Amino acid sequence: MRLRNIPDALERIQNQNLLVKTPWNIDDSWIIEIGMGKGKMISQLAFDNPNKNFLGVEKYPSAAVKSIKYVKKYNLSNFFILISDAKDLLDQIKGKASTIWLTFPDPWPKNRHYKRRLTYKDFLKIYANLLVKDGILKLKTDNLKFFEFSIESLKENGWKITYQTNDLHNSLVNSSNIKTTYEEKWVNLNYKIHYLEAIFI
């Protein structure tokens, strides 16, 4: 589905004091979601974990602005937004986070686009530099081929997969899972969601 452009999206985010000024300093109290979309999942995490800080990274302001309704609903003071491409994160963020989420990234299915996948080795280096020792990278996707690519890429680039499942909603970790807007759509169509956790070793 094409994202509808919202001309004043960036201004609306700024007016809510949600937009971070770069470079933004973080520590191990921070959890990052890359490609947060409308922010449903990360805002719920922020509400459930008031002693932690959450940074939603989104390339498109017209998607990120939708998170404002959740900020208001939950009265959040521990959630912030960075408008950025994932490849630029080391220039935008200083410090190390405890967890990075990749939630339903574009699988870039064509072989010639494999370097754009967010689990390609160049991106994995960025995440390794943004995570504390034993920090966790978490991935959710509905695309099995992308999931398989991600598993191999992680193994080949110094990561250890500590948990994986091809059916998140019938797994041991489902009780703590918070669905994204995109995820809810596919679950209603009985799609299986693939999930993994990994640490850099």
From Swiss-Prot:
GO terms for cellular component: tRNA methyltransferase complex. The active site is at D106. CDD domains: AdoMet_MTases. InterPro entries: SAM-dependent_MTases_sf (IPR029063), tRNA_(Gua-N-7)_MeTrfase_Trmb (IPR003358), tRNA_methyltr_TrmB_bact (IPR055361). It catalyses: guanosine(46) in tRNA + S-adenosyl-L-methionine = N(7)-methylguanosine(46) in tRNA + S-adenosyl-L-homocysteine. Substrate binds at K110, D142, T180, T181, Y182, E183. Keywords: Methyltransferase, S-adenosyl-L-methionine, Transferase, tRNA processing. One of its GO terms (molecular function) is tRNA (guanine(46)-N7)-methyltransferase activity. Pathway: tRNA modification; N(7)-methylguanine-tRNA biosynthesis. Catalyzes the formation of N(7)-methylguanine at position 46 (m7G46) in tRNA. This is tRNA (guanine-N(7)-)-methyltransferase. The lineage of its organism: Bacteria, Bacillati, Mycoplasmatota, Mycoplasmoidales, Metamycoplasmataceae. The gene is trmB.
